[in-house]
Swiss-Prot record:
Function, as annotated: Catalyzes the initial step of the lipid cycle reactions in the biosynthesis of the cell wall peptidoglycan: transfers peptidoglycan precursor phospho-MurNAc-pentapeptide from UDP-MurNAc-pentapeptide onto the lipid carrier undecaprenyl phosphate, yielding undecaprenyl-pyrophosphoryl-MurNAc-pentapeptide, known as lipid I.
InterPro entries with a match to the protein in the record: Glycosyl_transferase_4, PNAcMuramoyl-5peptid_Trfase, PNAcMuramoyl-5peptid_Trfase_CS
PANTHER family: PHOSPHO-N-ACETYLMURAMOYL-PENTAPEPTIDE-TRANSFERASE (PTHR22926), PHOSPHO-N-ACETYLMURAMOYL-PENTAPEPTIDE-TRANSFERASE HOMOLOG (PTHR22926:SF5)
Membrane topology classification: Multi-pass membrane protein
Pfam families: Glycos_transf_4
Catalytic reactions of this protein: UDP-N-acetyl-alpha-D-muramoyl-L-alanyl-gamma-D-glutamyl-meso-2,6-diaminopimeloyl-D-alanyl-D-alanine + di-trans,octa-cis-undecaprenyl phosphate = di-trans,octa-cis-undecaprenyl diphospho-N-acetyl-alpha-D-muramoyl-L-alanyl-D-glutamyl-meso-2,6-diaminopimeloyl-D-alanyl-D-alanine + UMP
Organism of origin: Chlorobium chlorochromatii (strain CaD3)
EC number: 2.7.8.13
UniProt KW Transmembrane keyword: yes
Upper lineage: Bacteria, Pseudomonadati, Chlorobiota, Chlorobiia, Chlorobiales
Protein's name in the database: Phospho-N-acetylmuramoyl-pentapeptide-transferase
GO terms of molecular function: metal ion binding; phospho-N-acetylmuramoyl-pentapeptide-transferase activity; UDP-N-acetylmuramoyl-L-alanyl-D-glutamyl-meso-2,6-diaminopimelyl-D-alanyl-D-alanine:undecaprenyl-phosphate transferase activity
């Protein structure tokens, strides 16, 4: 909204200084700084409020070191969501579907996560919101995004062919499978981020790194010259997604101020599901959904460790009568906890892995 106001003032009075409002880099930086300041200013008040009302119990199955931690207020994802929504509302073109689809995704899955946290912490419902209800929420969001892209003529490029990373002339046409693909990606990534949210600063830090990568690709995809040169799909209006992504980056960084070890608050499903859905929708909007598993490699590894653990346990129990495990505990970060690694060391090493995945995704721009 601030963008429209400043543009209106500039159109009337022609202030040279206000011309910067037309530059994506300026508005992306402004949105990022705004999101950071909002989290830093509101964070202490939200933490104080939630400490009196919303305390997350430590799971019984958690590693011994994890159970020693003091109980913390949850639903910290509300801070991320508020900072993101307000900064984007101020600096982005909110009438663009590339912007409001991400805003809706964050609000929608944030609401699903909030309900889960509320049931677990306030109503003391073991397990919180049933898994199939979460799945319904994810599927409904996927249907909204997929069907809107399918029927809106301005977004026709999204449902057409997409490029394949590492292959210069290889493309895939989803055809009638576009909407199911959208549903799968949103469900998979939102669950992956949710699984990763198990240590102080882990999900927020790795998410911030992934959003930096998405911001870069969004900026390139929104520029016809860069997109053509780099052989990636050109997305008309896709540059606005860079503003959205940078707001998410700094909302996560601001949250890390309070969530780094020892954490004062945790994001809960309110934050993890919102961040995961935003990551998926952004990748879909800039036609980088096939690159997302690499860019979000840490989340993929965490999910893979859980799937592999469950499948191997069931397989060995069926074959031998006794289930065996590959990892000491899944997701993967708990495996390293049980091996005696300090929590800070696990988190920082996972951040380093996230940076490596981010750099590898950048390499695909030329390795084609």
């Amino acid at each position: 909204m601030l963008y429209y106001f400043l543009k209106y003032i500039n159109d009337i009075y022609h202030f040279p200084a206000l011309r910067v409002i037309d530059y994506l880099t300026f508005r992306a930086s402004a949105a990022a700084i705004t999101a950071l300041l909002i989290t830093l200013l509101i964070g202490p008040k939200l933490i104080a409020y939630l400490k009196q009302r919303i305390i997350e119990p430590i799971k019984e199955e958690a590693p011994p070191e994890h159970r020693k931690k003091k109980q913390l207020p949850t639903m910290g994802g509300l801070l991320i969501i508020f900072a993101f929504e307000l900064s984007v509302f101020l600096w982005a073109k909110v009438d663009s579907p590339h912007v409001w689809l991400v805003m809706v995704a964050v609000l929608w899955m944030g609401a699903v996560g909030f309900l889960d946290d509320y049931l677990k912490v306030v109503k003391k419902v073991k397990g919180g919101l049933a898994a199939h209800y979460k799945l319904i929420g994810q599927v409904l969001l996927g249907l909204l995004v997929g069907l809107y892209a399918w029927f809106d003529p301005s977004m026709a490029v999204l449902r057409d062919t997409t490029t394949v990373p590492f292959f210069k002339n290889l493309t895939i046409n989803y055809g009638i499978f576009y909407v199911p693909v959208v549903i799968f990606i949103i469900t998979a990534i939102s669950n992956a981020v949710n699984l990763t949210d198990g240590l102080d600063g882990l999900a927020a830090g790795t998410s911030a790194i992934a959003f930096i990568g998405l911001a870069g690709f969004a900026y390139l995809a929104g520029n016809a010259v860069y997109a053509t040169y780099l052989n990636i799909p050109f997305i008309q209006g896709g540059g606005e997604v860079a503003i959205v992504s940078m707001a998410l980056v700094m909302a996560c960084v601001g949250f890390l101020w309070f969530n780094s070890n020892p954490a004062e608050i945790i994001m809960g499903d309110t934050g993890s599901l919102a961040l995961g859905s935003a990551m998926a929708v952004i990748a879909l909007l800039i036609k980088q959904e096939l690159l997302l598993p690499l860019m979000a490699g840490v989340f993929v590894l965490e999910t893979f460790s859980v799937s592999l653990q469950v499948l191997y346990f069931k397989y060995t129990r069926k074959r031998t009568g006794e289930g065996k495990r590959i990892f000491l505990m899944a997701p993967l970060h708990h495996h390293f906890q049980l091996k005696g690694w300090a929590e800070q060391k696990i988190v920082i090493r996972f951040w380093i892995m996230a940076i490596l995945f981010f750099l590898a995704s950048l390499m695909t721009l030329k390795l084609r």
